[in-house]
């Protein structure tokens, strides 16, 4: 609804700007502390017109004509700004739209195909806490883009050819594989033992090098052992992702781009640019004119390709199949992501959009798969579920165990997802489960509780025969400040989706979710719903609670959080 409001404001301002004798193609709209929207257009026009921004704003305001039935109530000049307020048509139209569209409210306004890659951790062990941020940011972005209307395909790019996989493959022939363990954890066990063995006996490293050469040449037996190792690890990783409510559509493997000839082809395309040179026997790409002093190695001295080379082929493939390609990478990929983008630009291919995130840690310290000192995502999720159960048990001791377990899982996973996604990607963060699970703080559990509260109000209204979802609503009665604030916040749903889809900053949607829950709780605090003095007013307010329930449910789903009906 807010996008429709913006469109109407833009049209009204365009006409007024033209009538005032100015020209502009962007009304420079933004949020305002004094109104529903504000325009800074007068600042830009003032320099051209050689007038003060205040005078320009007043001239435009004097030409404002608001069509009948518009969502816009008024436009006024305040100094150099043009402030815009939404009217009753907007307020009442929003409520009616939510009741009519339900789960579809606020979505499906964009089009285009997007390939989004996230997580893509090496399959040499389980996901750890550091990987979780990648998964949650990527999955949330995918949900935002899908709800906005894009055709989104989510990829987990599987490194099935790298040195680490060669070590795992080699290790499976040397060490016992614990089939009683979760497969990704069992893979980590043999990988850690293999690294210790290779450190103790450096001469065995040549066996790893040989495996890498054989797999790139297409040796069937070597490929089979690599596939076995990778598939075991990925099967365990999928289980962990499912626990977090994260799912991928495709798991493309690096090796497929070797087998298809895409890697050889892209090497030739890069050579054709005249940017390649031989450096100590390796083929490198000179990207100095893109600001990179360090060359990019795309082929080793023994003729084998690198992860980067195969990644270039993968991105070329993606670019041919989508309007936008998006990658979620950790901060340690800043350099390589820039080189990747520059190389694709140099050969005239579609460039990816990157979401680079800083790392998440725990108060306990850092994580490393190579040394065996890490805290797995499984360990964290099990711990958070246990702690969530204790919180639910304290609050609802009278409820059966299965209820507590179900709510604990929903709330626990929601706490992890929300606490991580609420932080801007470029900021590092420390995950503290006590803070994440604090029902008094405005985190995931607070938003979920707001939804459960709405469900409880509606259930009580139905049980007491006070309301039916089929009842018509008199929107003209919803005039209290807290009612109007809640309706305006719900109307912002599509605008927040649009903003996040364009800027790829999911934390802003998490902030919106918290503000929406707060607006609902403020409404319930300041107005009487079930005990409203007038029957028609009571029915309208209950219907508004139902609208809030639907938008809260949509918001939680977009964030990948469960929407419990009772907590």
Swiss-Prot record:
**A single GO cellular-component term on record:** cytoplasm
Task: List keywords of the entry alphabetically.
Answer: Aminoacyl-tRNA synthetase, ATP-binding, Cytoplasm, Ligase, Nucleotide-binding, Protein biosynthesis
GO biological process entries: arginyl-tRNA aminoacylation
* Record-listed E.C. numbers: 6.1.1.19
Q: Which Gene3D superfamilies match?
A: Arginyl tRNA synthetase N-terminal domain, HUPs, Isoleucyl-tRNA Synthetase, Domain 1
InterPro entries the UniProt entry points to: aa-tRNA-synth_I_CS, Arg-tRNA-ligase, Arg-tRNA-synth_N, Arg-tRNA-synth_N_sf, ArgRS_core, DALR_anticod-bd, Rossmann-like_a/b/a_fold, tRNAsynth_Ia_anticodon-bd
Q: Which reaction does it catalyse?
A: tRNA(Arg) + L-arginine + ATP = L-arginyl-tRNA(Arg) + AMP + diphosphate
Q: Where in the cell is it found?
A: Cytoplasm
Coordinates of motif 'HIGH' region in the sequence? Answer: 121-131
Top EC class per UniProt?
Answer: ligase
Recorded GO molecular functions are: arginine-tRNA ligase activity; ATP binding
Q: Does the keyword Nucleotide-binding apply?
A: yes
Q: Which NCBIfam families match?
A: argS
The family this protein is said to belong to = Belongs to the class-I aminoacyl-tRNA synthetase family.
**This protein is called what?**
Arginine--tRNA ligase
The scientific name of the source species is Methanococcoides burtonii (strain DSM 6242 / NBRC 107633 / OCM 468 / ACE-M)
